[in-house]
């Protein structure tokens, strides 16, 4: 063995000493200074016995000459690894006594600095090995069989903002005044790094988002409850050797401030990352509610005056503060196994003061009653997330096993104060306070295995377990005639929510007659229970139950087909079945919130709604033009709809509740066009045109509402000389169909200008809602009442931010620091000014 080892050393030295490094670059390209951060690794095996070839020599040579760049000996287990490699074209030469020397072409660039060469077989007979090519730059829009990926790095309007700013310009995505996000006019599930999260987009800094995956029809890998699709937010991760970081600060009108710092260090087997972000802003909001009640016959349960007109105006001031911290590390156990441990911490507050003025007029327009109401809200929250991920890849390209455990916890505390001043009839001041506390936790465990059988065939399987538990206490007090605060039991609630889902899936994809297909089946076992513990009220469901009933609520298939056509064309067809289970507030037959004219109550008779989703996608690229169109259909059985009607005991009050409709159908055409006519100019336009038909039962009568609607987006971005960038974004949402009415038109435009200096320092100025036109609202038209509601959150503001990026790609940075310290620390040139 000793002789073999010495011969191997001699063979390796022979390869390395054939020529010196050109230009003294020490691993860089000849005459250049490319970053030396590449990494190649693999395993050398005997082609016949499949045993490791210990002490085989591995040498990396320049592509067009025999100058050696790097080399090593194969370890006992067959592994080899070459680090600190520059970018370019190379030849990998592997040789050993008694085996045929083989060479393999290697191409490396910035887009993939780590490359697993798999199992390389040494045999007496010469074998031809395939070239290894590192992937090209990512396109702005990427389309695969089950998702589309939008890289948001170039959206300069999102800098210094939140996750809402990062997604509001994405085609087919809309954001309302309350921060609710919709995809093709449906509520969408928010994932972070492929996992469900308790975070909202408003709590995630936009500068920490690398890209957003838009999954309009999720495959069986994901929850069957993702009926509106998924926005999978991928946070930034940097695995380049050395260190890099970002420092950012911003200021805006109306007390808008933000700051962020992040740092990433990779050395040897560890990649450590951390960041902190602070964001605060003040918003001024206003709105109104105008209602006209129909003429009703006398009621035996209500003998007072039934008012004809109700008008309410609102003005609101809200201050939001967020702090977001993230830290973690990757540990590269070996060439194919990685362990990642990370954690997030979020802390913040919402404080608002809302002033309402309301007036009731009778059928003759005379003033009947009115007054003022002041609502004060103080909310603080914290959220923490811990995650452990393990990934193991195999020599076979694409084969991998991943498993993860995610723990989320949080606490929210809220104090509401309602003060009512009644003008007519004159009444004493009414004071009501409510204190709420909501601790919650959630865990998700997931394991996935992917096994490619050949270039076109792949088998996937996985399991997932999800559990969520929350405990809410809400105590309400009214001020009595002598000034004491007395408990108000009607609005005092202590409730607990338990949500459990266990799932397993199988997925098979292959190719036949040039058509790629994917077929999968998901099974979900679900349990849900909500309890109002202080009133002994509860509701629960379990699918399937103990007797295995309702199995139809548990199986969810999905199929996908795609075909690449000549001239850069691709066509896709997909179908899936989903379920939307009613939640606690939709089920509980109890008043949860109220004001002078509205109350909300659940319906314990609600059943799940089932959705059948289908899409036909077509994508084509002509040079600098890319066009993507999608025809989609959503058919819903037993849709859960929100309806409202006058309270029988007091028709002046509107009851808001839920019920299952008969069915609903949405058909739409979603079109996105991206054009780069000249260098530096990027144009994007999106139009989503859809038809909605929804029907529900009102007593014994079937009520139907239907019609067309559309949303549109457009953006223009141009890079001027001097590293200036100008971006203009416009959004339009036409009135959309509701069960009892329509929404209000929403329209606004933003403009952003950015200046970059040496790709290190960037200044950005944003003017949001240039014309101050953004407003949300609804119009309801029923046989019992007609109501218009409008709300406007302050959306026109200026925001200025400065971002500084620093770093050095150097895998031996700490070794150099240690060496410099030994030498007295006089030479700092290799550190770019210090670290």
Range-by-range predicted roles:
Residues 527, 567-612, 633-656, 736, ...:
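Surface-exposed extracellular loop regions of Gram-negative outer-membrane beta-barrel proteins
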Residues 62-67, 89-105:
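A short, solvent-exposed loop/turn motif at the edges and junctions
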Residues 63-79:
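Short, acidic Ser/Thr/Gly-rich low-complexity loop/linker segments typical of extracellular
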Residues 224-232, 239-288, 320-323:
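Outer-membrane beta-barrel translocator/receptor signature
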Residues 116-120, 163-166, 199-200, 213-214, ...:
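N-terminal periplasmic accessory domains that precede
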Residues 23-32, 45, 57-61, 95-97, ...:
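Short, acidic, small-residue-rich periplasmic hinge/interaction motif at the N-terminus
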Residues 169, 195-218:
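Short acidic/polar hinge/loop motifs at secondary-structure boundaries
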Residues 433-434, 442-446, 488-493, 601-603, ...:
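Outer membrane beta-barrel strand-and-loop segments of large Gram-negative receptors
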């Amino acid at each position: 063995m000793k002789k073999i080892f010495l011969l191997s050393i001699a063979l390796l030295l022979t390869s390395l000493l054939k020529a010196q490094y050109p230009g003294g670059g020490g691993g860089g390209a000849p005459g250049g200074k490319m970053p030396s951060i590449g990494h190649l690794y693999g395993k050398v095996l005997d082609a016949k016995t499949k045993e490791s070839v210990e002490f085989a020599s591995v040498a990396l040579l320049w592509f067009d000459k025999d100058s050696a760049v790097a080399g090593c000996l194969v370890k006992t287990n067959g592994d080899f690894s070459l680090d600190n490699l520059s970018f370019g074209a190379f030849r990998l030469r592997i040789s050993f006594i008694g085996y045929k020397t083989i060479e393999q072409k290697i191409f490396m660039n910035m887009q993939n600095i780590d490359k697993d060469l798999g199992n390389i077989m040494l045999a007496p007979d010469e074998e031809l090995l395939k070239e290894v090519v590192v992937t090209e730059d990512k396109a702005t829009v990427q389309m695969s069989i089950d998702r589309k990926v939008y890289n948001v790095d170039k959206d300069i309007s999102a800098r210094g903002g939140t996750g809402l700013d990062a997604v509001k310009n994405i085609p087919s995505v809309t954001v309302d005044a309350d921060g609710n996000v919709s995809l093709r006019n449906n509520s969408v599930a928010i994932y972070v790094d492929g996992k469900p999260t308790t975070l909202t987009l408003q709590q995630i800094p936009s500068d920490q988002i690398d890209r957003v995956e838009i999954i309009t029809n999720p495959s069986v890998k994901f929850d069957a409850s993702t009926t509106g699709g998924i926005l999978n937010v991928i946070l930034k991760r940097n695995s380049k050797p050395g260190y890099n970081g970002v420092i950012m600060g911003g200021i805006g009108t109306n007390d808008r401030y933000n700051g962020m710092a992040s740092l990433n260090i990779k050395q040897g087997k560890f990649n450590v990352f951390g960041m902190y972000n602070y964001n605060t802003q003040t918003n001024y909001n206003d709105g109104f509610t105008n209602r006209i009640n129909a003429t009703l016959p006398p009621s035996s349960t209500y003998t007072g005056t039934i008012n004809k007109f109700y008008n309410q105006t609102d003005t609101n001031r809200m201050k939001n503060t967020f702090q977001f911290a993230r830290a973690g590390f990757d540990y590269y156990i070996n060439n194919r196994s990685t362990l990642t441990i990370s954690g997030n911490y979020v802390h913040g507050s919402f404080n608002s003061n809302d002033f309402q003025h309301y007036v009731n007029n009778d059928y003759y327009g005379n003033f009947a009653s009115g007054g003022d109401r002041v609502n004060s809200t103080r909310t603080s929250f914290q959220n923490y997330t811990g995650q452990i991920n393990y990934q193991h890849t195999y020599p076979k390209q694409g084969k991998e096993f991943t498993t993860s455990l995610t723990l989320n916890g949080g606490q929210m505390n809220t104090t509401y104060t309602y003060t009512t001043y009644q003008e007519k009839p004159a009444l004493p001041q009414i004071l009501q306070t409510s204190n709420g506390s909501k601790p919650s936790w959630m865990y998700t465990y997931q394991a996935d295995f992917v096994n490619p059988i050949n270039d076109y065939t792949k088998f996937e399987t996985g399991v997932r377990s999800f559990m969520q538990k929350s405990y809410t206490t809400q105590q309400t007090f009214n001020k009595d005639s002598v000034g004491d605060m007395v408990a108000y039991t009607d609005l005092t609630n202590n409730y607990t929510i338990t949500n459990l889902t266990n799932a397993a899936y199988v997925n098979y994809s292959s190719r036949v007659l040039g058509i790629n297909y994917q077929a999968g089946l998901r099974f979900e076992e679900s349990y849900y229970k909500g309890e109002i513990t202080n009133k002994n009220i509860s509701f629960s469901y379990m699918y399937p139950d103990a007797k295995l009933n309702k199995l139809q609520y548990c199986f969810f298939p999905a199929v996908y087909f795609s075909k690449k056509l000549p001239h850069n064309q691709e066509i896709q067809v997909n179908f899936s079945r989903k379920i939307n289970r009613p939640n606690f507030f939709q089920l509980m037959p109890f008043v949860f919130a109220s004001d002078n004219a509205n109350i909300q109550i659940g319906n314990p008779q609600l059943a799940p709604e089932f959705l059948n989703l289908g899409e036909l996608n077509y994508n084509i690229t002509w040079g600098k033009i890319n066009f993507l169109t999608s025809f989609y259909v959503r058919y819903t059985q037993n849709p859960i709809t929100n309806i409202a009607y006058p309270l029988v005991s007091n028709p002046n009050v509107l009851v808001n509740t839920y019920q299952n409709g008969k069915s609903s159908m949405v058909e739409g055409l979603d079109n996105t066009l991206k054009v780069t006519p000249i260098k530096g100019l990027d144009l994007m336009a999106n139009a989503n045109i859809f038809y909605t038909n929804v029907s529900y039962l009102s007593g014994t009568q079937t009520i139907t509402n239907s019609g067309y609607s559309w949303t549109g987006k457009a953006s223009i971005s141009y890079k001027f000389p001097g590293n200036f960038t100008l971006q203009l974004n416009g959004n339009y949402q036409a009135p959309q169909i509701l069960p009892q009415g329509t929404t209000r038109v929403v329209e606004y435009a933003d403009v952003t200008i950015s200046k970059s200096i040496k790709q290190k320092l960037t200044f950005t100025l944003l003017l949001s809602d240039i014309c101050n036109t953004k407003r949300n609202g609804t119009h309801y038209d029923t046989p019992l009442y007609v109501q218009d509601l409008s709300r406007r959150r302050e959306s026109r503001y200026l925001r200025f931010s400065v971002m500084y990026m620093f770093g050095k790609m150097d895998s031996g940075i700490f070794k150099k620091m240690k060496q410099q310290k030994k030498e007295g620390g006089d030479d700092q040139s290799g550190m770019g000014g210090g670290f």
